[in-house]
């Protein structure tokens, strides 16, 4: 299990939204590169980055901040938000990004995702953002009629590295992960699933380490880390102990 600390970028700054609302953004750090270094120093193994402006614009809008992050940390970085073409994917991977996250384009053009997986194996994840059980697109601003599992199953066997599932109704409000829908998705597909949206406390970490949740690749944490509700040392110690137990 991997705990992914999150950096959401708006106007070149690290922010957190409530319920995906760009008008409810709290600035946590004006220096994204420094935040990336801090997460690495705390012992995290990965970094999850979202270009919020890019998600709405349909193209990279915080490119300078992302490049600064890539230079500042040795940790692998996954990036979502505004990545819509094969050229975008290739450009980011060539700059040292480990994994791109395709969200809106996965709904609008699933064949592009499949082609991207062929061209860039192990470097493509699909972001499924859901509100009321339906997939949302364009930076969560538009709802579709597509179901979560229906979309995920389109990519079975394509080589998608992971599905990042975000429950928008819980994002940024520390309500706890939606375990029922997250585990239902993980049971429905063979693609590794990463939980996002609502992670609130060490209890969520402990829940993720229970046998029925170990099929998950990990979880993303934003506000709970920034607000100090989750102590990084304690969280990472729990995960380390669980890994040691599995390999014993």
Curated annotation (Swiss-Prot):
Chief localization: cytoplasm
Gene3D superfamilies: Aldolase class I
GO molecular function: 1-(5-phosphoribosyl)-5-[(5-phosphoribosylamino)methylideneamino]imidazole-4-carboxamide isomerase activity
Pfam families: His_biosynth
Transmembrane segments: none
Xref: InterPro entries: Aldolase_TIM (IPR013785), His_biosynth (IPR006062), HisA_bact_arch (IPR006063), Isoase_HisA-like (IPR044524), Isoase_HisA-like_bact (IPR023016), Rhodanese-like_dom (IPR001763), RibuloseP-bd_barrel (IPR011060)
GO biological process assignments: L-histidine biosynthetic process; L-tryptophan biosynthetic process
Protein's UniProt keywords contain tRNA processing: no
Involved pathway(s): Amino-acid biosynthesis; L-histidine biosynthesis; L-histidine from 5-phospho-alpha-D-ribose 1-diphosphate: step 4/9
Cellular component aspect of the GO annotation: cytoplasm
Compartments (UniProt record): Cytoplasm
Family: Belongs to the HisA/HisF family.
Xref: NCBIfam families: 1-(5-phosphoribosyl)-5-[(5-phosphoribosylamino)methylideneamino]imidazole-4-carboxamide isomerase, PRK13585.1
Protein name per the record: 1-(5-phosphoribosyl)-5-[(5-phosphoribosylamino)methylideneamino] imidazole-4-carboxamide isomerase
Native organism: Rhizobium johnstonii (strain DSM 114642 / LMG 32736 / 3841)
Lineage of origin: Bacteria, Pseudomonadati, Pseudomonadota, Alphaproteobacteria, Hyphomicrobiales
């Amino acid at each position: 299990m991997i705990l992914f600390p999150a950096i959401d970028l708006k106007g070149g700054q690290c922010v957190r939204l409530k319920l995906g609302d760009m008008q409810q953004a709290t600035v946590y750090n004006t220096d994204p590169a420094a935040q990336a270094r801090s997460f690495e120093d705390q012992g995290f193994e990965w970094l999850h980055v979202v270009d919020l402006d890019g998600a709405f614009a349909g193209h990279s809008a915080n490119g300078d901040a992302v490049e600064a992050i890539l230079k500042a940390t040795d940790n692998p970085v996954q990036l979502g938000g505004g990545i819509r073409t094969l050229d975008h994917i290739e450009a980011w991977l060539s700059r040292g990004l480990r994994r791109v996250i395709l969200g809106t384009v996965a709904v609008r053009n699933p064949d592009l995702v499949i082609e991207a997986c062929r061209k860039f194996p192990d470097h493509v994840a699909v972001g499924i953002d859901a509100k009321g059980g339906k997939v949302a697109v364009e930076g969560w601003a538009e709802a579709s009629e597509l179901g979560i599992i229906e979309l995920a199953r389109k990519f079975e066997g394509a080589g998608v590295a992971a599905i990042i599932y975000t429950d928008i109704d819980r994002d940024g409000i520390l309500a706890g992960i939606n375990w029922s829908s997250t585990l239902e998705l993980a049971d429905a597909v063979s693609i590794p699933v990463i939980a996002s949206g609502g992670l609130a406390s060490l209890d969520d970490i402990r829940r993720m380490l229970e046998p029925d949740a170990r099929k998950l690749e990990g979880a993303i944490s934003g506000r709970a880390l920034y607000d100090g509700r989750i102590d990084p040392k304690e969280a990472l110690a729990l995960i380390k102990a669980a890994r040691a137990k599995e390999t014993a």
